Amino acid sequence: MSYDVAIIGAGVSGAMVARELSRYNIKVALVEKCSDMAMGTTKANSAIVHAGFDAMPGTLKARLNVEGTAAMPGLCETLHVPFKPIGSYVVAFSNEEVETLEELKARGEENGVPGLEILDKEAIHREEPNLSDEAVAALYAPTAGIVCPYELTIATVENAVMNGVEFFRNFDVTAIEKNAQGNFCLLYTSPSPRDTR
């Protein structure tokens, strides 16, 4: 079999790439070494959709983090996957840690994260009454949320497959070689290699 693109790995990242490429008139294979999708790194995902204040300003990670977080509610709605926009707190237990919160807030604002605010002791205990009495402040990021990484990956792969992507399980790629025609060939533990341009 021959494909224009082969995506190695059916975790959340591979699934998203497959879904995006399924919008084009190309033949796409999504290959996964495990018996199903989301069985590698994705299974250990914390489910947190981070607001974007951690990444260093000006980096690709910072830009994609903020753009991805903004896109997540709409993506989840389209794929019928629950997204919970619960926000997040980074809690400080000393004045020195409050300085770190201020640095994170400034970094987040430079990255374009909307709505960041530092809450004082009274405000955080009003919002989170079970929080330790030792907490003195918190950075609140309203755009953070949670989504089940399994549900998101499964829905994304299903959408890609409905749009023409072919999904192969138990497909452990052991090498990538160029064949006589100049195409790349995936060598794997099953018979008959898959060619890709």
Short names for language-model regions:
Residues 188-197:
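Single conserved hydrophobic/aromatic residue that forms the stacking wall/gate
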Residues 47-127, 136:
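Dinucleotide-binding Rossmann-like beta1-alpha1 core, especially the glycine-rich loop
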Residues 96, 131-135, 178-185:
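A short, glycine/Asx- and small/polar-enriched loop/turn
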Residues 5-29:
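N-terminal Rossmann-like FAD-binding beta1-loop-alpha1 element of flavoenzymes
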